[in-house]
């Protein structure tokens, strides 16, 4: 969502803050989870009605007209918390109707992640989403099926639901099913982005670490502390094993890559003598 125009980024930041305030005031898992689910449902409605999608984000119309339309369409169909967030979103200025819709997706995700936070499960959800992204990276046939746009979104979600059943938290499942049904890029990157969003909500940036052997909890924490000192911010370690590295590890933080692997050193040595 970082590719939004400035006006939409400002609108999303404002409504995100208001959402946090509303959920904190109520402070119940059920309300946060319901808000997230209902916001996703609203997105489904907007996806199926282009006229409505344009009207609720039409910046040429008075803000109160847009708010009134939201009330007329969704009043009595969603919870009061969700309705107020929708009205708040409609009151803001968005660069395009598409970005308004994208903003609602982000708000739905945020509400579900807040529900996980209230249960003390946000770290677990982050880890589950990252692990799922790695599974999708390895299981190309599954990922291909989940990427098949010739299948409707319900079929793709049903397939993933069967894979996830009983293996992850309800929040992880809800987030993954939403992004598979309405993908932004591809299943691997979309699910990894959800994991990064969970880390960000905990005040951490993500370091993607590929090592020759599995890192234990102590090693991951030590690495997180070291990277935190280097980058000046708290870090969340998303690690996976690749034995082809022979030894050491490769660390990626944003666009920066630190290659400390044995295979990388050998490759650089070969290049020196080429």
UniProtKB/Swiss-Prot annotation:
Assigned GO CC terms: plasma membrane; proton-transporting ATP synthase complex
Q: Which UniProt keywords apply?
A: ATP synthesis, Cell membrane, CF(1), Hydrogen ion transport, Ion transport, Membrane, Transport
Q: Name its cellular compartments.
A: Cell membrane
- How does this protein lie in the membrane? Peripheral membrane protein
Q: Which Pfam families match?
A: OSCP
Instruction: Enumerate the InterPro entries for this protein.
Output: ATPase_OSCP/d_CS, ATPase_OSCP/dsu
UniProt superkingdom: Bacteria
Q: Which GO terms describe its molecular function?
A: proton-transporting ATP synthase activity, rotational mechanism
- Where do the coiled-coil regions begin and end? none
Under the heading PANTHER family, the entry gives: ATP SYNTHASE DELTA CHAIN
Q: What does this protein do?
A: F(1)F(0) ATP synthase produces ATP from ADP in the presence of a proton or sodium gradient. F-type ATPases consist of two structural domains, F(1) containing the extramembraneous catalytic core and F(0) containing the membrane proton channel, linked together by a central stalk and a peripheral stalk. During catalysis, ATP synthesis in the catalytic domain of F(1) is coupled via a rotary mechanism of the central stalk subunits to proton translocation. This protein is part of the stalk that links CF(0) to CF(1). It either transmits conformational changes from CF(0) to CF(1) or is implicated in proton conduction.
Q: How does it assemble?
A: F-type ATPases have 2 components, F(1) - the catalytic core - and F(0) - the membrane proton channel. F(1) has five subunits: alpha(3), beta(3), gamma(1), delta(1), epsilon(1). F(0) has three main subunits: a(1), b(2) and c(10-14). The alpha and beta chains form an alternating ring which encloses part of the gamma chain. F(1) is attached to F(0) by a central stalk formed by the gamma and epsilon chains, while a peripheral stalk is formed by the delta and b chains.
Q: Name the family the entry cites.
A: Belongs to the ATPase delta chain family.
What is this protein's record name? Answer: ATP synthase subunit delta
Q: Which organism is it from?
A: Corynebacterium efficiens (strain DSM 44549 / YS-314 / AJ 12310 / JCM 11189 / NBRC 100395)
Identify the coding gene.
Answer: atpH
